[in-house]
Amino acid sequence: MKQHLFGLIPVCLFFATACSKRITPTEISTANPTSPRAVTTAPPATWQEHWFEHNQLLQLKFYDTSVAVYFDNDVNPSITWPDSYLGQAWDYTKATYGSFGGDSRLFAIFHAGKYSGGHPSTYFDTSHDLRNVIDVGSSDPNAWTSGTGNDIDLTTHEIGHIVEGASKGIHNSPAFGIWHDSKWMEIYQYDVYLGLGRTSDATRWYNLKIPTIDDFPRSGTHWFRDWFYPVYNGFGKTATLNKFFSLLGQYFPRHTVTNGVFSYPEYTWGMNFGEFVHFWSGAAGADLKQLALNAFGSLDESGNDWTVQLAQAKLDFPAIKYTDITGLGTLSVTKENSGGAGATEGSSKLVDNNYNTKFFVGGFPAGFEMQLTFPSAHIAGSYTLTSGNDLPDRDPKDWQLLGSNDGFTWYVLDVRTGQTFESRNQTRLFRTTNTNTYSRYKIYVSANNGSVDFQTSEWRLIEY
């Protein structure tokens, strides 16, 4: 992305100039009138650029209710993949994150032989005539012909910037100063590809991003591998991505500004790293502090201890709840590791908040139980389990979560069957509908995935 528009407050109002060239209906591709995405009112047939160094008179090549595609005069007019793909990506985005203004369309602009890279604009910005825009270019005069690889990666990336800059009807991206340009997009794009059923693109993207290394907030950071993918894969996937923006919209400070046409809410400032971890923990429904420490270390880019910021964020935003109560309880298991609870793979490792240790027991017993007993009652609304570092057939497969206040009468709170873990040391979140307080919680494991042994790296209980 070449330019960011999230922080711009235009001092002038610009409108597209009158067009001297008319396009006949036969020159514009439109959706089938019987399609649910068909429209009766067309967007402008031409659009004069008036932003940054852009000065092209754009030609409308396709439109429906989801997308309006514009080419400059140097783009091959036979290219059609944006018509379907961008409409699908935009529809999926709106279905996931909500609407973006009153116009249902994404306005997609393509350049060939100029303006390498891309930028977004949102419906808040007069700079691009109050439209949700992605504007992409290439130095290659024959660009955009494949509709694969970088063609969809770059355009999807720019849509992701609209999400972070205009979700929930609020302008700006409070997290941009933390994840910079592209870290959020890496997980957004992965989710879009999966959501559209483009599994080969999702796999391609995953393989591209897993080895990616960044120098912020510290050198050697793997944003996708160690943060976004574990959060996504272990804690609710698409719903968690959306919930992050929902929580921002509910609780993060904002004020009202105007663009000269209408007034709208805008986030007041950027979040600090502790707030970032706090809001993502709220979105995940689990305490992500340890995951963040493993991924980023304890210092933000300026050298500040973000764990102090996190403690303050919990005070500043108390409505965001994800209290991990595991450490308040006493663990017991019905069969212990041969070396004892304190052994390298003893039961103490099950609740040590270290996702790289594990509990192992040889000779998996039928009806194995692990229990947490608390001095007072709590409402556990969710829990996590983390797979071991090897041999997936040792993972739990069928289990129940139960609660009790006396240790004799137990109530079933959650039942899971046929469960598998996609990767080693994968953390998965399981939500319950429990609203009752219990002083004892246990997981009863009736089957693993086939091994004579059993292992689990971590079990955490989350109070709502």
Go through each PLM region and give its residues.
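Low-complexity, Pro/Thr/Ser/Gly/Ala-rich linker/spacer regions in secreted
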Residues: 27-44, 311-334, 462-464
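Short helix/loop segments within enzyme catalytic domains
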Residues: 191-219, 232-253
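Zn2+-dependent metallopeptidase catalytic core
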Residues: 38-126, 152
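Zinc-dependent metallopeptidase catalytic helix centered on the HExxH motif
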Residues: 128-211
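Short consensus segments that form the blades of beta-propeller domains
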Residues: 175-176, 217-220, 390-393, 450
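Bacterial Sec-dependent N-terminal signal peptides
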Residues: 2-50
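Beta/coil-rich, acidic/histidine-enriched accessory regions frequently appended to metallopeptidases
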Residues: 257-329
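Aromatic, loop-rich ligand-recognition surfaces of beta-strand-rich domains
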Residues: 340-414, 424-464
